[in-house]
Every structure is written in structure tokens, then in C-alpha cells.
Amino acid sequence: MKNKTALKGGTYSIVLTTIVLAILVVVNIFAQALPSSVTQYDISSTKLYSITSNTKVVVNALEEDVTIYWVVQNGKEDDVIEKLLDKYDTLSDHIKIKKKNPDIYPTFTKKYTSDEVANNSLIVECGDRNRYIAYSDIYVTSGSAYSGYSGTTSFDGEGAITSAIDYVVNSEQPKMYILNGHGEAELSTTFSNQLTKENIETEEFSLLTTNEVPDDADFVLINAPSSDISEEEKNMLENYFDNGGKLLVMAGPVESGDLPNLYSLLSDYGVKSDNGVVVDTDHDHYAFQAPYVLMPTIESSDITDPLLDESYYAIVPIARGLEIGNTDKDVNVTSLLTTSDEAYSKAAGYNLTTYDKEDGDTDGPFALGVDITQDENDGQMIWYASSYLVDDTYNSYSSGANLDLVMNSISSLVGQRDAVSIRSKSLQYNYLTISDSTSSILKLVMIGVFPIVYLAVGIAIVVKRRRANEAN
């Protein structure tokens, strides 16, 4: 009787063990069938393997099929790019990923580009529109002219792919006209590259040779003029704004003279500009021991909230002070960037010899950026009181926040409030890297050794109980 009871107990344990193992096998098979977005969690500090909400806005709006061709030889696949493409594949039924091995299809890329195509390059296509994404546009390399060293510093796969998708599905892209004829600065390399990435077409124009802003302008950029516009040009720009036009202005102090006609665009709408260089003596509001390199308070708005959410700081060097007052015009004026109460404007401008307050200097606080909107006709003017906001050096000092601020401003102007800039992701950290042999050992331990050990322990317990029962 005791032996029969022990046998039943042992049989029960074996059956239970078998059932548990069967459940584990089924769960494992089910888990492998799930998409990577469900089974994998991105714990990297820069969310290297994650898709941002900006991409989801673009992808979820797709109504046409988009094909992403992954040009790569067998065995040369980049793991990060592969995981990123898996994310896009699971994000929408309108996106298809197709791998093209150049050894098998040696002429495939010729119809898209004349460049020599490296492994892990991509081609995004929708209908008769396409864009080629070079591997060097995905892994961004930077270097130092002083050290001669260059290396891969950031991963821009998501930004490049999402930009390409947006480009191929939209035949009409925003167009920015750049005012010239007043010694305006050239666009910085970083700014120009970002405009291309954001699919914004650019064209220069002069109001000296035409009597109005071109009809196909989505907005006009006035970038760091060194001399003033004429009264006639000012009237044309004001008429453009009053009739629903969009303006983005980055204009700070000039080394000699003033820009009264240009800044009268602001004063007509209740914003006064002081002709000087703002210094801020509050240590929390300037950088690099230079009180004219300002770190203003970022005020909450649709344009600035993405920076606030990520705790970024804008750096605004050599700026004029703006003061928001009253106006009889039907406009709303929103301050985007502000100094501390300890700021003042140095009347000496570029010729200042001291940061101390002197006679003739104007007390702050000041706004350094404003957003002026019209309720009646959707006119909008965003104005930053520094000519160096997207200068490559100062943008680098801000960790890219300055460029993000300007690109968010452009998104606001062209009505793409959700499609703000997608930042590249830094690679300046240590990876957790394991070899293939270590990976194989871990798989063997998890899939083979652990279940066998579990089964062996169960058998040992059954045998021990049986012997104990026999002894009794």
C-alpha cells in the first residue's frame, strides 16, 4: 500500500514537471512569434533602439505603401539598423522592409543614386518618389581640426528614415525664402543640413528686385543682417505679415550703426528693441564666464515645451533686449526666452569695456525671443534677438538645443506642430558587448541546462520520497 502511494506521488511529480515544461515551451514559442516592440525593452541611456512620438505621427498618417530597401551583403548586417527597421516594420502595415544583397543585385542601386553604396545603406521609395540614405548619414562622424581625430559620434537612423518617409509621400514640401541684399550671414552648416533633413526647400530672394514676397513662400527667413532694410522693404514685409504671412527673424546687435527699419517691424506690434548688447549678471543666466553669452529662462509654449521636457538650455550670445508693451493691433505676443531681473542692455554695444552698469544702460528684464501671432489672418512672426543663435559653435555649446528651438519655430510657422526635430542619438557611451560564443553558452544554459536541472531536481525529490516511504 505504501509502495503504491509512493508510486502515485512520484508519478504525480513527473506529470507536473512535464506539464510545467510543456507550458514553458509553449510560452517560449508564443513569445518568439511576438513582434520585437513587445518582447524587447530599450534600456540604453539614449533610447538608441526606440522610436519617438514624432516618427509615430508621420507613420500613423501614412495612406500609401512605402518600401524601405536595405542594401547589405549577407553577414554584414548592422544590428542597430536591423532592430530599427524592425520597429518601422511593426509600426505600420504601409511600411515594407526588403533586403537587397548587392552581390545578387549588383545594379539595383543605379536607378536611385550614382554614388558608391556602402553596406547598410537604405533606399526609401513610394510610387515615383525615392530618397537614398547613405550609411554615413545614419552613423554621423565628426572630428577635430586640431587633433586630426575623427570618429562616429551619433546615430541618426530614425531622423534620416522618418525624413525620407515624409519626403516620398508628400510631393509638396514647405518652402523657405531667405531675404538677401543686407549683408545677411550664410546659413550655418548644421542649420542647412537640418533644413534638408526636415524636407524644407530654400531659395534666396531680394525685395530690392521685386515688389512682394513670392506667392509660394511658406515663410520668410531674415538671418543676421549687417545693414538695415529700406522703408519700402519694411512696408512689403509688414503687408506680407498682415495678410497671413510667416516670418522668422534672427537679428542681434550690429557692429556699427543700427537697424531701425527692421526693428520697426517689432515696434509696430508693441515690442520695443533696445540698441545695445544685453549682459546678465545673474550667474544662473550666463555661460563661460561671459555675461553676454546668455542662458535665458525658457518660457512654456508649443515651441519651447520640447526643450523644457528634456531639460535643455538655449545659449543666446550677443543679443538685443526686447520689451513687450501695449499695441492697438489685434495680435498676441508671447515671450519665448527671458533674462533675469539683473540683466541690462549696454549702450556701448560691441564697444563695451566693462560688464558693470553705466549711465545710459537700460535696465531689464528683457525678452530675447518672441512669438507674435494674428488672430484674424493667421499671420505669425517669430523673432530671436541674436544673430548667432544657430551658429555651429554656440549650437554645439547648447548640445543642439538652439537648433531644436529654431526648427520647432519653423514647425510652428508651417503648421507642423507635431513634427518637431528628431535629434540624433549619441554613441558616446559603453556598450554591453558579448561574443557569439558567450551568446551561444547563455542560450544553452537558459534553454537546455536550466530545464534539465529542474527535471533532475524533481526526479531526485521523487526518489528521496520513495526511499523514505520504503524505509517506513
Name these PLM-found stretches.
Residues 2-472:
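Short, surface-exposed patches at the edges or C-terminal ends of soluble domains, predominantly
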